[in-house]
Amino acid sequence: AAGSVPATNQLVDYVVNVGVGSPATTYSLLVDTGSSNTWLGADKSYVKTSTSSATSDKVSVTYGSGSFSGTEYTDTVTLGSLTIPKQSIGVASRDSGFDGVDGILGVGPVDLTVGTLSPHTSTSIPTVTDNLFSQGTIPTNLLAVSFEPTTSESSTNGELTFGATDSSKYTGSITYTPITSTSPASAYWGINQTIRYGSSTSILSSTAGIVDTGTTLTLIASDAFAKYKKATGAVADNNTGLLRLTTAQYANLQSLFFTIGGQTFELTANAQIWPRNLNTAIGGSASSVYLIVGDLGSDSGEGLDFINGLTFLERFYSVYDTTNKRLGLATTSFTTATSN
């Protein structure tokens, strides 16, 4: 049967408690739909038990920010009430860029793991979701994610549900869209979408990008970012690296409309800003307003033109459906929240 695990919003990422071994040691792993290897050892060391078994492989992954390398083991992994025997995990001997987490729970598409093992460079590594399904523990190969906005630096307000959706966590119905055929977004939880600002300003015409719980900001291609910056009147803030608005500009900030799978999802003005009472946590000023839309760093038309990150997903329920090769989104009771 399906099972749910609570997730903690740490402002820049979400983590879940993952048990490894028997008896289990608990690790705090970053929930990442943008990568597919599960690994630990960034903070708390790996504790070997009778269920721990080294394979003959080394494992290494390089991320958008950070990397790790180490040894592959198989071990019993527990996620809430769900148990996964013989799950592959990486045990880091070196890592960089992972403060505040023990490692990553990689729940992206399995093919992203090809090339991460050595010498078995052509072998893929089933994710926790894949194994839960193949071992018959959950009825369908699917992960559903509920994130919510936060006004504190750590809030256990999220939920991962393996094998089902949780209807108490969303409103209306779920809109599904097929995984895009455009490369390189197609290798990830990639979708096609358009973005407009307010009633009529096009920011991004129909294009491919990815939905990624492991990216904090909502990133758009550089040319689209320039249009957004101009439309909002924002200026680049050197202290935070974010766009900054005055309170007067914020009062005039329009919604961003994301059209996905024939449905339009509204990212409200409040959803576009960093939680104001946490401005100082990122080096900002308490009296300013900072935007969570950032510059992807490459122009549109390259096959990965946006990343709908954690800040987007705090406002919508998301479903990562491997069985049907599709991604689902739904509104929630937090879609129009004004807590930021």
Swiss-Prot record:
Q: Does the keyword tRNA processing apply?
A: no
Q: Pinpoint the Peptidase A1 domain residues.
A: 14-330
What are the alphabetically sorted keywords of the record?
Aspartyl protease, Glycoprotein, Hydrolase, Protease
What CDD domains is this protein classified in? Answer: pepsin_like
**Where's the active site on this chain?**
32, 212
The reaction(s) catalysed by this protein are: Milk clotting activity, broad specificity, but fails to cleave 15-Leu-|-Tyr-16 or 16-Tyr-|-Leu-17 of insulin B chain
Q: What is this protein called?
A: Polyporopepsin
Q: Which organism is it from?
A: Irpex lacteus
